[in-house]
Structures are given as C-alpha cells and as structure tokens.
C-alpha cells in the first residue's frame, strides 16, 4: 500500500526527489552522479527539487558538444554586482556535455567549506548512469560533426580554467550579464535562485549575425579566452587581456609583441596584426591543434571553424593605421 501512495505522489508531482546535502558536502565524492540527487531521473536529466536549469549567452566552445546546465543553491542569492553570483557553501553547478541524445560527461563544481572543488563523471553508452572518473578519459566519438577525439578532464585539470586571481577554483559562467537572455533572470527570480533582476548590460551572443562584428568577436574572446587572459588571472604575465571590460588596444593584442617567443608565436611578430589574421599570433594559435601551440590549451581537440571565421573577420576589420 505504501508503494502505491508513493507512486501516486510522484506521478502527481506532490513529492519530488531532493538533493542529498550530506553527500554533497562529504569529503569524498560518491561513485555515481545519481547519489547526489540532482536529478529525479538521471537518464533524462529531469531536475530534482531546488535544481534549476539555466543557460548563458556566450558559451565556451567544447568540440561542438551541447551543454545542459543546472544550479543548486541552498539559499536565495543576492546579485548585487556583476561578479560571479555569491554562492553559499552547499551550492553546486552541474553541466552535462552531450551530442544529440548521447550524454558524454557531467562536470560538477561544489562549494564546500574548504572552497570550490570539481568532479568529472563519465556516462555509460546507454546514458543511464554516470560514474566518477577522477583520472579523466579520452574518447573517440562518432558525431554529426565527424569523429571527435573527446577529452574528459581529470580532477586536477579543473583548475586549468576555473582559477581566480587568488589561485582558488571558482565558477566562470554564472555572472548576471552572462545570464541576461530571453527573460532568464526573471525566471531565476521566480525559481528562487536570485532575489531580483540586476541592472546589467547583457553579454552579446557571438552567434547572432545581426550584432556588430566587433561586439560578437569580443564576446567570443571573453567566453573562450578571458578565464585566463585577464588582468590578475593565470595568463596575466602575457599582457594579453581579452575580457569584455578591457578597452586598451595594446592589451587587446593590437600591434602587441608576445612576451615569450617560441613555437607558440609561429614566427609571427604581434598578437593581432590589424587587417591580417594570417599574420596574427592570436589567430595562429586558435587555428592549431598542436598541444604546444593551441589556444585554449584545454577543452577542445577540434577547430572551431565558425569561431575562426569570426575572429578572422574581426581582425580584417581593424584599421592597420591605428
């Protein structure tokens, strides 16, 4: 009889699965993604109570994988600034990478009392269960974009992108301006994630051909490069700052000589040679799959042809005399 009552509650929406906060904050991660309780049904990614789907305007290129993003926070967030949302301890960001219906991996960032920590989970071929894979994995996937040598990052590689000015792991995407798309901030208020809609200028969607070329290109560089290439972040010493707030042409790479020569420069002289993408180190490194040359260093094993075309057009549009 009890089973029938429970089934009735589940079918009518009167009872929903909840996140297991004890497992979430444990010192060691569980073997399976399902143990966290983020999803009522992991195979369909149907979120549990308190887990909210979201998206960002300008996503990082990840070998053409689609991404399903979710937020879990035990408290309503007050987005007073346009920095990263002030996630309390016990919060989690969940991101699943997939090609069509084929789920490949889910990455989790959890805010524990010791700071943020990231864990990679690898899905089985049936898409019914994801298992902890601290060592990462190399997969050969047959996708609609062709064969892709997909790399699941290992536990230590999370910090390769998710590192702040203090050397600590931190989220990247959930800033109000990255979330400001198609009423999403209003939805996050209604869902109890944030207290109000902050007054921010939305990050441009670099995929929108109706926007000015420069805005699209700057947004692309922000999404794919600025997690390292910004003042105070891991690539600070390069002097190449590609975040949207940067407005100094030299720090944006225009006529800027590289700090360090070597294979990464390809024998070229400046990061951006206005009017000539083929003479620009920035374009050269984006157009490479050589591990000692390519940028970004992590997160891709294929070329982003649409991104390359966008940055090439942007460089051609720059005035060589300025």
Annotate each predicted stretch with a short phrase.
Residues 31, 36, 59, 68-69, ...:
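Flexible, active-site-adjacent loop/turn segments at secondary-structure boundaries
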Residues 60, 66-219:
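Extended surface/linker regions that mediate inter-domain or inter-protein docking
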Residues 157, 224, 294:
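The −1 position to Zn-ligating cysteines in a subset of zinc-ribbon hairpins
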Residues 18-70:
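N-terminal pre-domain segments of enzymes
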Residues 1-7:
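Sec-dependent signal peptide recognition
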Residues 184-218, 227-233, 241-322:
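Electron-transfer interface patches adjacent to heme c in soluble/periplasmic c-type cytochromes
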Residues 8-17:
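Hydrophobic h-region of N-terminal signal peptides that target proteins for export
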């Amino acid at each position: 009889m009890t089973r029938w009552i429970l089934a009735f509650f589940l079918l009518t929406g009167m009872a929903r699965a909840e996140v297991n906060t004890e497992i979430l904050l444990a010192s060691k991660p569980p073997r399976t993604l399902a143990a966290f309780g983020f999803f009522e049904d992991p195979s369909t990614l149907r979120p549990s109570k308190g887990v909210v789907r979201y998206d960002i305007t300008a996503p990082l290129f990840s070998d053409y994988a689609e991404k399903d993003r979710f937020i879990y926070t035990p408290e309503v967030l007050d987005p007073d600034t346009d920095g990263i949302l002030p996630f309390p301890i016990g919060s989690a960001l969940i991101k699943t990478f997939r090609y069509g219906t084929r789920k490949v991996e889910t990455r989790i960032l959890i805010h524990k009392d010791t700071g943020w920590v990231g864990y990679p989970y690898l899905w089985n071929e049936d898409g019914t269960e994801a298992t902890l894979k601290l060592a990462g994995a190399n997969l050969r996937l047959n996708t609609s974009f062709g064969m892709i040598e997909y790399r699941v990052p290992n536990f230590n590689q999370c910090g390769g992108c998710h590192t702040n000015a203090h050397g600590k792991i931190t989220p990247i995407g959930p800033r109000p301006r990255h979330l400001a798309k198609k009423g999403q901030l209003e939805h996050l208020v209604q869902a109890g994630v944030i207290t109000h809609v902050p007054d921010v200028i939305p990050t441009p969607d670099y995929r929108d051909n109706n926007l000015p070329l420069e805005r699209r290109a700057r947004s692309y560089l922000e999404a794919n490069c600025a997690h390292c290439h910004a003042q105070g972040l891991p690539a600070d010493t390069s002097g190449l700052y590609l975040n949207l707030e940067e407005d100094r042409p030299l720090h944006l790479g225009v006529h800027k000589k590289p700090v360090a020569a070597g294979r990464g420069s390809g024998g070229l002289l400046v990061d951006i040679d206005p009017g000539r993408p083929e003479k620009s180190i920035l374009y050269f490194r984006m157009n490479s799959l050589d591990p000692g040359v390519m940028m970004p260093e992590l997160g891709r094993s294929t070329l982003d042809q649409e991104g390359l075309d966008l940055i090439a057009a942007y460089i051609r549009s720059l005035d060589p005399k300025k």
